[in-house]
Amino acid sequence: MINLPDVTLISVDTTDDLSGTLNGVYTSMSGINFGDVKLITTQEQIDNNPKLVEDGITMQTPVRDIKNYNDYNYYVVYHLHEHVDTSHCLLVQPDGFVLFPDKWDDAWLEYDYIGAPWAFVEDAYIDPFGRHWRVGNGGFS
């Protein structure tokens, strides 16, 4: 088992069906002891899933509404850090989670973000502050 006390495993899912997200969370937890594990979800899901707390998953509501894909993306970029108390976090999703924990490399902690770079496009990927974003597609950060 790998110990990563400075890494929070985190996921955001405000839908009615957490099964894919929980698969990603539990699969990621199977070979790694994270400093914290958090699921950002609705109050209804928190009320209906007390077993998750027993399994060591802290459940929190989002600090702003997430109603669609654009809200989700905005939330992850601008609000996810409000839920993280460790130096790093690993965001998992139903289609992106840890499969081979034995491949972990502590050198990854030297980077502030690991994700796929996007090509520069003059009129695209601009944040609300006018800055161009050139990375996306989730990753270890």
Q: What label would you give each PLM region?
A:
Residues 27-28, 78-80, 102-105, 129-130:
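Short, flexible, glycine/charge-rich loop motifs used to bind or transfer phosphoryl groups or to couple energy/partner
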Residues 134-141:
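Short glycine- and hydrophobic/aromatic-rich loop-to-beta-strand nucleating segment
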